[in-house]
Amino acid sequence: MDTLAAIGRWLSKQHVVTWCVSREDELWCANAFYVYDPDTVAFYLLSEEHTRHGQMTGQRAKVAGTVNGQPKTVALIRGVQFKGEIRRLSGDEEARMRQRYVKRFPVARMLSAPVWEIRPDEIKFTDNTLGFGKKLHWRRDAGAEQA
């Protein structure tokens, strides 16, 4: 099984990411609709800079987060935990990803919030549909492993 492909297929079917940032001794989390790009292994989202999490992020920050479904039974639990970096996009890169975001979420056409990229360095995918407690791990610098 191609671990990253399996993770990517599942992430492409979801739409809400929880991401957390810190500054000094303060932590804060936010939720956002996202577009997942399997080529860059990254999430793209819109978020205002004036929010608490936007202020804490600045132009770039370390980030951790989750994506999870809402299954009715333990046997169907699937979810991702990740850590990496979040950065604000600009110029052509922002325009390109905004276009892709608006294609998936047409209501976003009305929003002027900046586009952000969450680029995970590490992903852990729990997939109980493959067996209770089955974990797939991916690291940007190392590829894939299973547990």
Curated annotation (Swiss-Prot):
UniProt feature coiled coil, ranges: none
NCBIfam families named among the record's database cross-references: PRK03467.1 (NF002900)
Family: Belongs to the UPF0306 family.
HAMAP family hit by this protein: UPF0306
Matching InterPro entries: Split_barrel_FMN-bd, UPF0306
Disulfide links within the chain: none
Domain of life: Bacteria
Name of this chain's protein: UPF0306 protein KPN78578_35330
